[in-house]
Structures are given as structure tokens and as C-alpha cells.
Regions:
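Alpha/beta enzyme core
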Residues: 2-242, 246-275, 279-280, 284-314
């Protein structure tokens, strides 16, 4: 039975590598919260990446550079709680692996505190020693080459395809080999020409997960908000499979209209209490109720002095 057929336990790195060896294409989506993780897990997505992209698509930051370890751990833990089967990968944020000691400490927090199975690290040759140290310490690592958003300022600041020249293409090949030899179990290949990404994939034993890198990779990853149509901008490499932004707006407008018209809440959304109990609370008789006359308790403020709480939390 394929690893994808098991729903009784969480997938492992060994399962992902087995799927790759069997020729299965590997889908991966980003997830940032409990309900989304639960839905994606139920849909059979084998890998969920808690990407630092959450800084832009969830928290409103202008780049991923501002995302902190505290934020990443918070969201990774939510995704782990929401999923039962998917392998959850925590994205190491900017400067959290600036030194090997930092990398070991922070990657350990992803596994120990948040419950992730693996971490993702950007960079090729320059990150190889860090990846090797993490793998030796027992931390599964997913690499990331091509366009690496955390390095955007050092790469000119503008999002652009990487590896279009002879020199940069050769450098990416070297990056990929270095990551594999350092012990990573897979790598993201982002914004790389299709032919180069396919060549990199063919030269590796480990799976490549492409984003904006063509169909020749071992698998694909997308940012969940792009797939669901949440946001005003959709990158060229994304395909929108739903329009949740429109659906949410329509639902919010309909609910607002119902509130203003007084049709929400209706009987189906309302709880009533026993009239006899209400009579006792208000200090009235059934005859008072039938006649519609106000009692002394009504005039005194519905008997609020009798212990009806005014400060209850919503």
C-alpha cells in the first residue's frame, strides 16, 4: 500500500522518500492555522509547510524578513494540532540560523515546542554546513534554492527568476548538489527556468518541490491564499482554484444586511427560556404576563439587583 493510503499515523520523511521512489508527484501547500490545516489534511495533502510567507499573507508585513521565531512557532503549533497525517515543516525565519548554534537551538524549538517534523532553510552552498549539523543532530531538513525571499535585499530587492545565465545556472546546480550531500531530504526550487529545474531534479536522488519552476520537479508547492483566491494579487506561477475573497465578502455583506433588517438572529439561532422561570426572575405572575403589565421589578430594572451578571465575557 502506498504511504498516501495510510490515515492512521503522521507521515514521516521516510514515507515522503518512498512516495518519491515510487514515482508519485508530491503536493505541498502552505498552512498557517488550525482550521486550514485540518481541511488540507482531510484533503490528503502529504506535506504542509508553515512558511514565513505568513508574514505577508496573514500578518500584513511588507516582507518575510520581519517574521519572528515566536510567530513561526505559534502558527506551526496550530498547524500540527489541526493535522493528523501530513508531515509538517516549519520555515526557519530570517537570521534564526545565522550560526550553527542558532540553527540547532531554533530548529530544536520547532520540533520540541511546536511539534513539527522538519524545518526548511534557505540557501545552497552557503547553508550546507548548517544543514549538515542539523541532520547530524536528528533534525530533518528541507532545503530551498533559487529565489530565496529572506535574501531579497541582497538579491536586488525585486522578485525575479534565478538561474537564467550560464554562471547563475551552474551556481544553482552546485547549490542543489550541496544541499543533497549535506543530508537534506528534499528541497524547494523557486522561480527557476523550467529546463534548469528539470535538469536539477534529474541529477538528484532527493525530491525537488517546485514553485514557479515548471512541471519537471518532483512535486509542487503553492501558497494557500493564492490557491484559494484570498488576496488582491496573484503571482504568475499560481493558479486560483477558488474565489474565497469574493465568497467571504458576499457572506459578510449578507450577514450585515440581515442584522440591519432585524432578521438575524431568527428563531433558529435563538434560545428561549421557560416562561414560568422568567416570571419568577421578573417577580410577576402568569396573569401579569398575559396582561402585559409591568411589575415593580420591571420598573426597578428587570430585577438586575438580584444577581443577573453584567460583566459576562463574550
Amino acid at each position: 500500500m502506498s504511504a498516501t493510503g495510510s490515515t492512521q499515523r503522521r507521515l514521516t520523511v521516510a514515507d515522503i522518500l518512498s512516495m518519491h521512489a515510487d514515482g508519485e508527484r508530491l503536493p505541498m501547500l502552505t498552512a498557517y492555522d488550525y482550521p486550514t490545516a485540518r481541511i488540507l489534511d482531510d484533503a490528503g495533502i502529504p506535506m504542509l509547510l508553515v512558511g514565513d510567507s505568513l508574514g505577508q499573507v496573514l500578518l500584513g508585513y511588507d516582507s518575510t524578513v520581519r517574521v519572528t521565531m515566536t510567530e513561526m512557532l505559534h502558527h506551526t503549533a496550530a498547524v500540527v494540532r489541526g493535522s493528523k497525517r501530513a508531515l509538517v515543516i516549519g520555515d526557519m525565519p530570517f537570521l534564526s540560523y545565522a550560526s550553527i548554534d542558532d540553527a540547532l537551538a531554533n530548529a530544536g524549538r520547532f520540533l520540541r515546542e511546536a511539534g513539527a517534523t522538519a524545518v526548511k532553510i534557505e540557501g545552497g552552498v552557503r547553508s550546507a554546513r548548517t544543514i549538515e549539523a542539523l541532520v547530524r543532530a536528528g533534525v530533518p531538513v528541507m532545503g530551498h534554492i533559487g529565489w530565496t525571499p529572506q535574501s531579497q535585499h541582497g538579491m536586488g530587492g525585486k522578485v525575479r527568476v534565478q538561474g537564467k545565465s550560464r554562471e547563475t545556472a551552474r551556481a544553482l546546480l552546485a547549490d542543489a548538489i550541496a544541499i543533497q550531500e549535506a543530508g537534506a531530504f528534499s528541497m524547494v526550487v523557486e522561480l527557476v527556468p523550467e529546463q534548469l529545474a528539470a535538469t536539477i531534479t534529474s541529477r538528484l536522488r532527493i525530491p525537488t518541490i517546485g514553485i514557479g519552476a515548471g512541471a519537471g520537479c518532483s512535486g509542487q508547492v503553492q501558497v494557500i491564499t493564492d490557491v484559494l483566491g484570498l488576496g488582491d494579487f496573484s503571482p504568475r506561477h499560481a493558479r486560483k482554484y477558488a474565489d474565497l475573497q469574493g465568497a467571504i465578502r458576499t457572506a459578510a455583506e449578507a450577514w450585515t444586511a440581515d442584522v440591519r433588517m432585524g432578521s438575524f438572529p431568527g428563531p433558529a439561532e435563538t434560545v428561549r427560556m421557560d416562561e414560568q422561570t422568567l416570571d419568577e426572575v421578573l417577580g410577576r405572575t402568569a396573569q401579569d404576563r398575559a396582561s402585559g403589565e409591568a411589575t415593580d421589578a420591571d420598573r426597578a430594572g428587570m430585577g438586575l439587583h438580584a444577581g443577573i451578571p453584567l460583566d459576562r465575557d463574550l
